[in-house]
Amino acid sequence: CIDCVVPIGNKLEDSKWWVIDWKSNFISGSENSDCLPGNYNYENMKEEMIKHHYPLQSHLYLLALHRLLKWRLKNYQPNLHLGGYVYLFLKGLPDIKLFEKSVEKDISPGVFIGQAPINRINYLDKLF
């Protein structure tokens, strides 16, 4: 089931809506078996996404969100309102103390973001 849906914007009718799903996958480094935030880079998370069919899952979640918004949001337009998906690999997120010390405030380890493939979602909506 979908973990979380959030609107990003000032007003609900103008917001982009995002699906958030958290994962507890263990991604170890090539030279060790430790589970460290550095192991949760884009390439490793992409590989994990494909391995576990998460792109398919994200499409199904976005289709469900698309149908909900079409039903509930007046003047819904997928290209304006459907944002995409965020996968949070919990074991890859940096410790808050490290984040507070960071000058760049980079929290990208453990965060995998994708835009909604609008044409594909519309096609799936018509398909079934």
Stretch-by-stretch model annotation:
Residues 1-128:
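Structural signature of nuclease core domains in nucleic-acid processing machines
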